[in-house]
Regions:
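N-terminal glycine-rich FAD/FM-binding segment characteristic of electron-transfer flavoproteins
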Residues: 30-312
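Cationic, low-complexity basic patches in intrinsically disordered or flexible, solvent-exposed regions
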Residues: 6, 11
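Short, Lys/Arg-enriched N-terminal segments with co-localized hydrophobic residues
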Residues: 1-3, 15-33
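Alpha-helical protein-protein interaction elements
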Residues: 12-13, 17, 24, 63, ...
């Protein structure tokens, strides 16, 4: 990383503009360093084409189109916004099968700097407990390879599991401050190592300031996800994510990963039936006539009676 400074230099009779380059050194040596932000994403089945195996109550992923989890993209967008505004290194991580590389490349096309795919048959069948264990250890390994992690972004939940447990689970395992259901990142103060956010509550908005390192779970209201640029797409096409398997985590407790480390039991799953409802258009000479027809049809349907209405 470099700092560029422009100056004027005499060359004979000419004065030319030049750029001086100096190293940007790490804060441990008394200088400055950019924030390191990790974004956790998941490749999920397209919810419009979900199928379920009735025997083991699991999602059938083979042959089903996959996308980046919707909420995770908002976490990535916020990390990229911070990168654009004040400088940051953004590393994206996912645990999943080899085809999840496609989702990581999409994140690279949007502006992420590095991507890590954690994939192994030993991780298969993981519930949220086992997943948070592996992801937390992956973030530890990322910090060893690319420097300490200041912020972690996750989506509030995934479209397939829908539990909202992995983000807080990772924060607990890493002993990070956690800010869930975030709708706005107000300020990231690198000098004070403080972050201020708005959190969505059932009865309002909570304004919270806490210290880095921290983990944030993102809501869709946080931002609008950008589109990939042409240079980003070109870089993504050439990019090869870092791939880690169980062999890269010799200290992992095998009893806490994959199916063995997943105490969750799914009793039953099903795909909701999509019922087709025939609509009816009501027309009349004026608004009053249309309203009269609508009221008459509602009474004929006995809906008001079922709801306890007895008329005026």
């Amino acid at each position: 990383l470099f700092l560029f400074k422009r100056g004027l230099v005499k060359q004979g009779r000419r004065t030319v503009s030049v750029v001086f380059v100096s190293d940007l050194f790490h804060k441990v040596s008394g200088g400055f360093s950019m924030l390191h932000i990790v974004v956790c994403i998941k490749q999920v089945p397209d919810s419009r084409e979900i199928r379920i195996d009735p025997k083991n109550n699991t999602l059938i992923r083979q042959g089903v189109p996959s996308i980046v989890n919707f909420y995770d993209l908002h976490g990535l967008e916020e990390a990229l916004r911070i990168k654009d505004e004040q400088g940051a290194r953004v590393t994206v991580v996912t645990m999943g099968p080899p085809p999840a590389e496609k989702s990581l490349k999409e994140c690279i096309s949007l502006g992420a700097d590095e991507a890590v795919l954690v994939t192994d048959r030993g991780f298969a069948g993981a519930d949220t407990l086992a997943t948070s264990y592996v992801v937390a250890n992956t973030i530890k390994k990322i910090s060893e390879h690319w420097g300490p992690v200041d912020m972690v972004f996750c989506g509030k939940q995934t479209l397939d599991g829908d539990t909202g447990q992995v983000g807080p689970g990772v924060a607990c395992r890493l002993d990070l401050e956690q800010l869930t259901y975030v709708t706005k990142v107000v300020k990231v103060d690198e000098e004070r190592r403080k972050v201020t956010v708005h959190r969505h509550l059932e009865d309002g908005i909570e304004v919270v300031e806490t210290s880095m390192p921290l983990l944030i779970t993102a809501l869709k209201e946080l931002n609008k996800v950008r589109r990939a640029s042409l240079p980003g797409m070109i870089r993504a096409a050439r990019y090869k994510p870092t791939v880690w398997t169980t062999a890269d985590f010799p200290k992992l407790d095998k009893a806490q990963i994959g199916l063995k480390g997943s105490p969750t039991i799914v009793a039953k799953t099903w795909v909701p039936e999509i019922r087709s409802i025939n609509g009816e258009r009501i027309e009349g000479e004026d608004e009053a006539a249309v309203a009269d027809q609508l009221i008459a049809k509602l009474w004929d349907s006995e809906l008001p009676t079922r709801m306890g209405w007895t008329g005026v």
